[in-house]
């Protein structure tokens, strides 16, 4: 038995023991809906992270294998960034449709089915010739489906708690743990089988995971107690155009977006312009609402949201190198001791599974003592930790520069150290970020604001794609040492210096942000 298969088996055994412990220890403190959403999101993340674990490797080794390494890497980073940008921009539309028209439940089921189909298209394509056309169609279904699913399952969870319910951060941390249980199992399973058996099997298992999530959500809908339904069912069922009601119009419109997204994933410059327009539109709309609001508190909370939006964007631009350039770095320059490259994507999720309860306990204890940091300071600590993670991998890479041309490899401990601090940074930012967005948002626009929050990740991914291209730009005939130096330069300049600069600005404006939050923690 090789190391990769041993990890796969050990991972499943660990989760089958750990999940019941988490659920049973928390079930009396929270509504039953939390645990239905926990399992639905677990399987959705299994689907996404299963594909993400090997997507960049599939592109460089199969889809663009006829290009030079530099050209293949550059094309793959660009597509990876554009796809993920659309993946996280689409929740803006999905959040609005759920708020105004179809409700959270229908949005979540529609998104899950779209993503299942997208994974199946990718599986078929990998098995039958690796054509770019079908590849982009599959990615488009995933991006559109994510738009319906991602913002609405988080917003739906928020409806089961009052604005200042002390259990809310705890609930979102448990929910976030569900995300990462799926993210832990997926690379171990889909990533391993994709590389050891066939890429099509990895995509297929990811699709079946998403179908499982939809089934869990639908079969347990009774626990939702009337929440998440369309805001106006007669209006939804009324005719929109040519005898087609509004519900069917939404579905048809989603299908019509598939060729549009397929084009945009390839047309990076056009995608850039669209993202800029969307970004300025979102921020302009939020700014307009902040200043026109009749309630001063509501307006100032929206201004806090905008500040956190920018910090969030920079964080994810660097954090999400994990599925892109860090995956390539691991594949080519790290001593993996027989572990599949894609399985390293499980390290972050494993640390979250282990550390999320610790962070929940820390925030709870500090909260009781009135010492818990406000959200802006948690974001500050997150930025410090991601910078430390990049500093660790830079030190590891520099340590082998003299012998990399002769086959020297980065010791695995540096990769694990980087993932550890990136994980603690993520735990300081992401679950509390989801929670605070629902608290800062006006009730009538929570879906839109949550969608806007995911757009900040879209911008982060787009920036991340450009960082990947900087890494993929050594001159023709570059040695391994020159290629590794490109990783070092980008990680040091962006992952350390720029991140620390953003952290310093956030530290100095935190007192003002705290004041403008008006009691929201």
Where in this protein do the model-derived segments appear?
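Intracellular juxtamembrane helix-capping segments at the cytosolic ends
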Residues: 148-162, 427-442
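Glycine-rich segments within core transmembrane alpha-helices of 12-TM secondary carriers
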Residues: 87, 167-187, 194-195, 202, ...
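Cytoplasmic membrane-interface "Motif A"-like loop-to-helix N-cap segments
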Residues: 100-113, 298, 365-384
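C-terminal ends and interior cores of transmembrane alpha-helices
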Residues: 110-130, 384-404
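Hydrophobic core of transmembrane alpha-helices in multi-pass small-molecule transporters
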Residues: 38, 42, 46, 118, ...
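Central cavity-lining transmembrane alpha-helices of secondary-active solute carriers
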Residues: 78-99, 346-363, 459
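Intracellular loop-helix junctions on the cytosolic face of multi-pass helical membrane proteins
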Residues: 1-36, 163, 191-327, 331-337, ...
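Short amphipathic helix-loop junctions that connect adjacent transmembrane helices
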Residues: 53-77, 322-344
